[in-house]
Amino acid sequence: MKVSRYVFVIASVFSVMTANAAQKGEGYFGVSLGQATVDDFCGGGESSCDDSAISLRIHGGNQLSSFANLEFGYRYISDVETAGTINGIGVAAAVNGHFIDTTLQLGMPETGPFKVFTKAGVLLWRLNYDVAASNGFQTFSASDSDSGVGFRTGLGATYEVSEGVRLRADWDFLVNVGSEDELGETDINVFTVGPEFLF
């Protein structure tokens, strides 16, 4: 219920921000694709483990001033997977995630085609877990999900390639994602690149 309220508040603020951007001509939206790496997902005792996955993010924002932006985004991170054997039983697990975030960005220089920026914000995360176990005769599988609130920070850069279009690269650090009741809390490093469109 608390997460649903957060989603409602973020959606409301985003709609107001978009309307304001449309009036002032200071808005932008973009899409980025890259790789996410989950810290401490692989412990070393697995027969196979992949702690990296594809990350896709869609975002939109409003320029508050010549050096500050307010931005909202949705990110999907595909499966990270691990498999191993425990007491003769084969076990496999996969986790993917959905993230909604709101972020304040501060960048410099204030003018020119190239800008670097830092960022800080909050995010709502939802992780989906799939687990399977087999003794060679029978297979058991289960699915679960969990949600919560975390933080995000990072660095980025944009370059205006033409009027109304710029190329953007980001490093995002997602903090305190996950629950101790499931696989535990972790941090996620994400590197992405993609186009951004001004309006």
Give the ranges of each region predicted by the language model.
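Short, positively charged, low-complexity/disordered linker segments
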Residues: Q138-R166
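Sequence contexts marking disulfide-bonded cysteines in secreted/extracellular proteins
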Residues: F41-G43, S48-D50, T111
